[in-house]
Amino acid sequence: MYDPVSTAMNLVPMVVEQTSRGERAFDIFSRLLKERIIFLTGPVEDGMASLICAQLLFLESENPKKEIAMYINSPGGVVTAGLAIYDTMQYIKSPVSTVCMGMAASMGSLLLAAGAAGQRISLPNARIMVHQPSGGFRGQASDIERHAEDIIKTKRRLNEIYVKHCGRTYEEVERTLDRDHFMSADEAKAWGLVDHVYDSRDAAEAGAE
């Protein structure tokens, strides 16, 4: 079966650096990690969450006071995997700036909003989508009832996280997330998901001054 993500990863370019000991080759993502840049791309799932959390913890150990930049292009995915990344972002000492490129949907939008205050950015043509969690269950009626109760608790917790980071009331968040709600970059800024919309590095650097 064709997997576009795996195919793309097999085509990752290499960067060659000259050192005092000769040449050293890095894949492009490892080289960017040296610059404290993390890419969160594709569906959010357990394997990806482990890699993102490991990178966050490593960069904190390198310099706990220096900013980490996380670039997000994700349709969302597994709630527990996304919350593992979220909790790690909040746990570490290093501030994490978030940048949306392409799309941040579902858990992707929550992680975008979870960046350090004043350091949440969207590129101008990015799309952001928020909604309530969904799930399907099979089995005995009592088991289905327990799963339903758990997903309602999860929904409340996710709503509380959006309230915390977006400055909206719980009622506003619940109403907006009731169905798939798509936003432009400017609409996401107005809603409180991001702090800035920049179309160039110069604009971002000028805004940071």
UniProtKB/Swiss-Prot annotation:
Q: InterPro entries, alphabetically? A: ClpP, ClpP/crotonase-like_dom_sf, ClpP/TepA, ClpP_His_AS, ClpP_Ser_AS
Q: Which reaction does it catalyse?
A: Hydrolysis of proteins to small peptides in the presence of ATP and magnesium. alpha-casein is the usual test substrate. In the absence of ATP, only oligopeptides shorter than five residues are hydrolyzed (such as succinyl-Leu-Tyr-|-NHMec, and Leu-Tyr-Leu-|-Tyr-Trp, in which cleavage of the -Tyr-|-Leu- and -Tyr-|-Trp bonds also occurs)
List, alphabetically, the SUPFAM superfamilies matched. ClpP/crotonase
Q: Which residues form the active site?
A: S106, H131
Q: Name the enzyme group at the top EC level.
A: hydrolase
Q: What does this protein do?
A: Cleaves peptides in various proteins in a process that requires ATP hydrolysis. Has a chymotrypsin-like activity. Plays a major role in the degradation of misfolded proteins. Required for degradation of response regulator CtrA, thus contributing to the G1-to-S transition. Required to degrade DNA replication inhibitor toxin SocB, this function is probably the reason why the protease is essential in this organism.
The name this protein carries in UniProt is ATP-dependent Clp protease proteolytic subunit
